[in-house]
Design a protein with these regions (language model features):
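Conserved SAM/AdoMet-binding glycine-rich loop
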Residues: 1-9
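Flexible mid-to-C-terminal extensions adjoining Fe-S/redox cofactors in radical SAM and related proteins
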Residues: 158-254
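Radical SAM enzyme [4Fe-4S]-AdoMet core and its adjacent flexible, acidic
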Residues: 10-137, 141-145, 160-164
Length: 254
């Protein structure tokens, strides 16, 4: 289960708020605890939406969750970088310091690692490879109106809807063009540039929905892995951590 936060309490409640004025941040945290109490076997990933304006809150939120959730198992945090996903790739947002670029995203991940914060991005190399839910025929997401999507980042944009639930809860009015485009239209190995790139398959092909926008909607998304251009830095951290684990294991045996 993936649950989203937009920063610490003040920031989150400014982004997501109720007319009643209820503390939405505390409601989310309490619901995570409730879910963990009722079904501790379910893995909960707290996805923290980050821009250049709130990136400094990630470390604080990480420590907050460590203290709040204590010894609870199967609850983890991961940064989710807000990139420009518009077709026009609005330069104003980048110039105003709102959105992450490839370079400052990679540097932020490395900075977290140097400060001792773990993240899925720093676990290099991955023990296995997998693809995004967009290309998984069993994955699906819904909006409040019953429209269905393959990608949770475009929920609410009906141009990407593959169908809609009818009154009986059955998926109907399937848009086969959109469905097939999202399932098969982002094959990395059909991209002449990517298929020759040395970072494939480490990158897993990048974000499929971005690739689809580039291919069919004339967007200019940067789909490359955070490792690109920074592989030596990631490897140094990986090697240092591996050595530290080996030393700790040796000391434990003595």
């Amino acid at each position: 289960v993936q649950i989203t936060l937009d920063g610490m309490k003040k920031t989150h409640n400014e982004v997501k708020h109720l007319a009643s004025g209820e503390d939405v941040f505390e409601r989310v945290i309490s619901n995570i605890e409730l879910l963990n109490d009722l079904a501790p076997e379910i893995n909960v990933t707290i996805r923290v939406n980050l821009t250049l304006k709130n990136k400094h809150e990630y470390a604080e939120l990480y420590k907050f969750c460590q203290n709040r959730f204590g010894e609870r198992r199967n609850i983890g945090l991961t940064p989710a970088f807000v990139l420009d996903r518009s077709i026009s790739n609005c330069d104003v947002c980048i110039e105003n310091g709102i959105l992450f670029t490839h370079e400052n995203r990679s540097k932020f991940i490395l900075d977290l690692a140097h400060k001792g914060f773990d993240s899925p991005f720093i676990r290099y190399p991955e023990p296995f490879f997998n693809e995004c839910a967009v290309r998984n025929d069993m994955a699906i997401a819904f909006d409040p109106e019953g429209y269905t999507y393959k990608c949770w980042e475009v929920i609410g944009n009906k141009e990407y809807a593959i169908g809609k639930l009818d009154k009986d809860g059955i998926l109907a009015n399937i848009n086969e063009k959109i469905l097939n485009r999202q399932l098969y239209g982002a094959d990395t190995f059909e991209d002449p540039v990517c298929s020759k790139c040395k970072y494939l398959p480490i990158c897993n092909g990048g974000c499929p929905i971005q690739r689809i926008q580039n291919k069919f909607e004339k967007a200019h998304n940067d789909c490359c892995t955070p490792y690109k251009g920074f592989t030596p830095d990631f490897l140094k951290i990986h090697i240092a951590r591996k050595k530290a684990l080996e030393v700790a294991a040796t000391e434990k045996q003595q």
